[in-house]
Structure formats: C-alpha cells, structure tokens
Amino acid sequence: MLDVVEIQKILPHRYPFLLVDRVVELEKGKSVKAYKNVSISEPVFEGHFPGHPIYPGVMIIEGMAQAGGVLAFLSSSEEEQEAAKDKVVYFMSIDKAKFRNPVRPGDKLEYHLEVIKHRGSIWVLDGKAYVDGNLVAEAELKAMIVDK
C-alpha cells in the first residue's frame, strides 16, 4: 500500500531512525498494519548486544509509534493533510508496555495498531508487534499532532 518513499513523505524520520519499511493495510480512523525488516547492518546492533544481537524493545515501541503516526496523518481530511505538511506527531505516553519475545536480525517485525480513542489532535492507540505470528511486544500509545 505505501512503500518507504511514500512513508518518508509523511514521517520526518530518516535512516537510521525510520523504523517502518512498508504499510500493508490501513483503514482510516481505525487501524494500520505495517512492517520493518530487521537487519544485522543496523547501527543499534553494534552495542545491543555484541555476539548476541537483540533488537531493543524501545525501538519496537518507536516503530509502532511511527506506524501510528502514518495512521493519524492519513486519517485526516485532505484539507487537514495539506495543513499537516507543517505538523509533526509527538509521542505523549506509553502505557502497559510488555515485551514478550526477543526480536533478532533477519526477523520481519509486523506492527498492528488500532485506534482506541481519537479526539481532536490526540490519538490513543493499542499497539502490538509480531514476528512470524508470535506476539513480541504490546503497548498503549498516546500521540498528538502539533505544529513543527
């Protein structure tokens, strides 16, 4: 549905901090499914952990937040999307975060987010991350669309 070039038109993040490779499904105002291919060549693996590389949980949460940002922007009206060029999504809070299984280089990390609540510029999302259909992380995320 959206490749990395299209995602970069929405999100301000760039390598090495753009953590969404592709959006595969999006239902405006409701949900998004996206993924990241985790590669051993990512800088984070230089120190986390040498000889036993594990993708950091905070990076999984950030990837979910980025997928949620795409959902928030694309759920806006065309007029709001045009105005959104001067806006950015700020992460406000993380609640109920749990890390269930490790993510390793070579894994396809899938993000599934559903809208719990949306009021004005504030979004509350239920985020889950999977590898091979197994839950690896989950959290409730709150974000706000603000002026740059």
Swiss-Prot record:
<comment type="similarity">
    <text>Belongs to the thioester dehydratase family. FabZ subfamily.</text>
</comment>
<keyword id="KW-0456">Lyase</keyword>
<protein>
    <recommendedName>
        <fullName>3-hydroxyacyl-[acyl-carrier-protein] dehydratase FabZ</fullName>
        <ecNumber>4.2.1.59</ecNumber>
    </recommendedName>
</protein>
<dbReference type="GO" id="GO:0016020">
    <property type="term" value="C:membrane"/>
</dbReference>
<dbReference type="InterPro" id="IPR010084">
    <property type="entry name" value="FabZ"/>
</dbReference>
<feature type="active site">
    <location>
        <position position="48"/>
    </location>
</feature>
<comment type="function">
    <text>Involved in unsaturated fatty acids biosynthesis. Catalyzes the dehydration of short chain beta-hydroxyacyl-ACPs and long chain saturated and unsaturated beta-hydroxyacyl-ACPs.</text>
</comment>
<dbReference type="InterPro" id="IPR029069">
    <property type="entry name" value="HotDog_dom_sf"/>
</dbReference>
<dbReference type="GO" id="GO:0009245">
    <property type="term" value="P:lipid A biosynthetic process"/>
</dbReference>
<dbReference type="GO" id="GO:0019171">
    <property type="term" value="F:(3R)-hydroxyacyl-[acyl-carrier-protein] dehydratase activity"/>
</dbReference>
<dbReference type="Pfam" id="PF07977">
    <property type="entry name" value="FabA"/>
</dbReference>
<dbReference type="GO" id="GO:0006633">
    <property type="term" value="P:fatty acid biosynthetic process"/>
</dbReference>
<keyword id="KW-0963">Cytoplasm</keyword>
<keyword id="KW-0444">Lipid biosynthesis</keyword>
<keyword id="KW-0441">Lipid A biosynthesis</keyword>
<dbReference type="InterPro" id="IPR013114">
    <property type="entry name" value="FabA_FabZ"/>
</dbReference>
<dbReference type="GO" id="GO:0005737">
    <property type="term" value="C:cytoplasm"/>
</dbReference>
<keyword id="KW-0443">Lipid metabolism</keyword>
